[in-house]
């Protein structure tokens, strides 16, 4: 699997991230580092504890990582969660929004794991 195929499997914006990082090897390097970021685990922990400010900060961080790496669907889901927490008032939609964010996160993590296990562009 190439890094382009990895991005295609998640509907990622490979061309957009290439415009920032310039080389497929750089895209691969930063993509492979993404699972080590703790933004999603921090978000989930804060969400489960009902901690609004930490949840906002973690969601905002996840959103930034996702947009910079071209993970479009994860970016959209994290953006919704970020806005949910922004003003400190959480609606009854948060459970469904978190489920969607987690599903998009897992999709990205699984694609990266598949890429890491079967790289053809290393």
Task: Name each model feature, range by range.
Residues 39, 51, 55-58, 66-86:
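Short, well-ordered alpha-helical segments
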Residues 11-61, 91-120:
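Long, amphipathic alpha-helical coiled-coil segments characteristic
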Residues 1, 22-24, 71-75, 91:
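Short, structured coil/loop segments at alpha-helix boundaries
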Residues 1-5, 9, 120-122:
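Non-catalytic signal-transmission and effector/linker regions of two-component phosphorelay proteins
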């Amino acid at each position: 699997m190439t890094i382009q195929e990895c991005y295609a499997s998640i509907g990622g914006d490979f061309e957009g991230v290439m415009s920032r990082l310039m080389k497929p090897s750089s895209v691969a390097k930063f993509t492979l580092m993404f699972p080590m970021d703790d933004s999603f685990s921090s978000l989930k922990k804060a969400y489960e504890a009902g901690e609004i400010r930490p949840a906002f900060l973690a969601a905002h961080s996840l959103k930034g990582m996702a947009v910079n790496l071209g993970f479009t669907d994860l970016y959209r889901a994290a953006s919704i969660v970020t806005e949910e927490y922004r003003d400190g008032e959480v609606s009854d939609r948060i459970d469904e929004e978190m489920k969607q964010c987690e599903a998009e996160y897992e999709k990205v993590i699984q694609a990266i794991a598949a890429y890491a296990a079967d790289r053809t562009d290393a």
